[in-house]
Swiss-Prot record:
Its main location: secreted. Belongs to the pancreatic ribonuclease family. Disulfide bonds join C26-C84, C40-C95, C58-C110, C65-C72. The keyword Nuclease applies. GO terms for cellular component: extracellular region. Keywords: Disulfide bond, Endonuclease, Hydrolase, Lyase, Nuclease, Secreted. Pancreas. Coiled coil: none annotated. This is Ribonuclease pancreatic A. Pfam families: RnaseA (PF00074). Substrate binds at K7, R10, K41, P42, V43, N44, T45, K66, R85. Its EC number is 4.6.1.18.
Length: 124
């Protein structure tokens, strides 16, 4: 079975990628990374930084998660990210996404040994 850490990588890390010149980025990636298999995942963020840098956030600024848990961490620096949002009127299996890029600090929930990201909480 896929571990939480592996699922995080599949859903949120695209180190070499960029959506800068590709308005279709989210449509392609959401499908490729299997987030449109049984439903259209409504919102998803991809981080275009090396995996090691994303994992390192687990030792950065400790903050509260949206759900009140205390195992969230905010990156000290802003990261190159792409936010994918389902367009209104889009219906499974024809999932259609709006692609927008940003430079933001990311907030992830971490757990396990090694202590690694398992959930993408927010970007600020």
């Amino acid at each position: 079975a896929e571990s939480s850490a592996m699922k995080f990588e599949r859903q949120h890390v695209d180190s070499g990628g960029s959506s800068s010149s590709n308005a279709n980025y989210c449509n392609e990636m959401m499908k490729k990374r299997e987030m449109t298999k049984d439903r259209c995942k409504p919102v998803n963020t991809f981080v275009h930084e090396p995996l090691a840098e994303v994992q390192a956030v687990c030792s950065q600024r400790n903050v509260s998660c949206k759900n009140g848990q205390t195992n969230c961490y905010q990156s000290y620096s802003s990261m190159h990210i792409t936010e994918c949002r389902l367009t209104s009127g889009s219906k499974f299996p024809n999932c259609s996404y709006r692609t927008s890029q940003a430079q933001k600090s990311i907030i992830v929930a971490c757990e396990g040994k090694p202590y690694v990201p398992v959930h993408f909480d927010n970007s600020v």
